[in-house]
Regions:
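Buried, small/hydrophobic-residue-enriched core segments of structured protein domains
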Residues: 26-73, 161-163, 176-415
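N-terminal secretory/membrane targeting signals
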Residues: 1-25
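N-terminal, Lys/Arg-enriched amphipathic/low-complexity engagement segments
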Residues: 56-141, 311
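Short, well-structured beta-strand-loop connectors
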Residues: 142-156
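Short, solvent-exposed loop/turn positions at domain surfaces
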Residues: 136-142, 159-162, 371
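Short coil-to-beta-strand transition motifs
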Residues: 162-170
Length: 415
């Protein structure tokens, strides 16, 4: 927190200085003393006006040149945190941080360990309801008993046929589940033991135009991995985002450890950032976690083609919406994109290998004996296969985090 109104500050100081003079003037018949006091008052008011204008101009120029925020005290006066001497972790390298004073420390039992396991999963699904803005009944291009490769198109959006949704695994389409009014709820695939991928011809990121990259993301099925704010929908391909935001950490309970997620995916992450940097008229912004004793992975802190911003505070400091508000809030008529750390990696993998690979790290926590850990799996994995034979009759399963996830059964699939 810093003094926002320098005029008020100077006015207070002026009052403290002038009050004795006024008292003297009132108690004295000497007109010279009264005139002197009035001159001092006028001078201090003039100084206050000059300081106020200077402070406002300084803030405007700082914002114009992109040097405001991120913990920088762009002001004529020291911030209260400067005066109190509060320290940020040394790994922030003096870059400052957004410090969120409010929030909640949500301590729940059953936190996942940092161990990573791989569990065999037989069934996977793509759920149209996971994608906001899509038509309630998308156009299927497959039927039950069809064989598909990982990356083959399953359906597309009727309102925009260029936006395609692909299979996360290779295997057989065993069921197309429908809900109310025949809306499709799940397209279920029985996975092959050995995965097979559709291989795409990948454009050169350095040489490709923005339009060429957009077309490739649409054709390859990666486009739905991106969200458009302020309404959190699958983006309109015709719009260019003002900025792109990625929160590299989550402060929600049981969230996966970002260092575990990035481990082994460093090149894919950087490649994903390189792609995204060509899709915006502004910048790619990365929110970094400054709450821990040790620094995040250097793949996150030393990333190229993106601006990094440190955040300190309780939940929801890891929420991308909170970070957008502090870094560069959305103005009227603007749209920005957001992605998760793991979706950036998936985009990068495509440009490195040509394969639609939506492998991911999830965490399982809570009152489930012996299962609290991280797991390597693929998007849309069956929840029952992941949990195995755990006794969950009297327990509630949540797909997603505890605060914003949905109640799910063992026969359902990860979002």
């Amino acid at each position: 927190m810093r003094y926002k109104n320098s005029f008020s500050l100077v006015a207070i100081l002026a009052t403290m200085i002038i009050s004795p003079q006024v008292l003297i003037a009132q108690s004295s018949s000497n007109n010279v003393t009264l005139i002197g006091a009035l001159i001092i008052i006028g001078a201090l008011i003039l100084v206050a006006a000059v300081v106020t204008v200077s402070e406002n101009l300084l803030q405007i120029e700082a914002k114009k040149h992109g040097i405001s925020g991120n913990g920088r005290n762009v002001s004529l006066f020291p911030s209260l945190s400067d005066l109190s001497g509060s320290k940020l972790p040394s790994y922030t390298q003096g870059k400052g941080a957004y410090v969120l004073k409010k929030g909640y420390e949500i301590n729940l039992t059953g936190k996942p360990s940092d161990e990573v396991f791989k569990k065999p999963v037989n069934r996977y699904a793509v759920r149209p309801t996971n994608f906001r803005g899509i038509a309630p009944i998308p156009k299927l291009v497959i039927s039950e008993k069809d064989e598909v490769l990982a990356g083959d198109v399953l359906f597309y959006d009727k309102s925009n046929e260029n936006i395609k949704y692909c299979s996360p695994v290779s295997g057989e389409i065993v069921e197309v589940r429908r809900g109310a009014k025949r809306a499709i709820t799940d397209v279920i695939i029985l996975a092959d033991k050995k995965q097979k991928y559709r291989v795409n011809k990948v454009p050169d990121v350095n040489k490709a135009s923005r339009e060429g990259l957009v077309d490739f993301l649409l054709e390859s099925g990666l486009w739905p991995l991106i969200n458009e704010r302020p309404f959190d929908v699958v983006p309109d391909p015709s719009k260019i985002p003002s900025n792109i935001f990625i929160s590299t950490f989550s402060t929600a309970p049981y969230a996966p450890n970002a260092d575990i997620v990035i481990d082994g995916n460093e090149d894919a992450f950087q490649k994903g950032i390189d792609v995204l940097a060509k899709l915006t008229s502004g910048d790619v912004h990365l929110g970094l976690d400054a709450n821990k004793n040790s620094a995040p992975s250097s793949s996150l802190t030393d990333v190229k083609n993106a601006k990094t911003h440190w955040f300190v505070g309780k939940h929801p400091s890891g929420n991308v919406g909170v970070q957008i508000h502090h870094i560069s809030s959305i103005k009227a008529g603007q749209s920005v994109w957001t992605l998760t750390l793991q979706n950036v990696i998936s985009i990068g993998r495509m440009f490195l290998t040509g394969k639609y690979d939506v492998s991911k790290i999830i965490s399982i926590g809570g009152a489930i004996e012996g299962k609290q850990a991280h797991y390597s799996t693929v998007s849309g994995a069956n929840i029952g296969d992941l949990l195995g034979n755990s006794d969950l009759d009297e327990k509630r399963i949540i797909s997603g985090d505890v605060l914003t996830g949905r109640t799910a059964g063992k026969g359902e699939f990860l979002d």
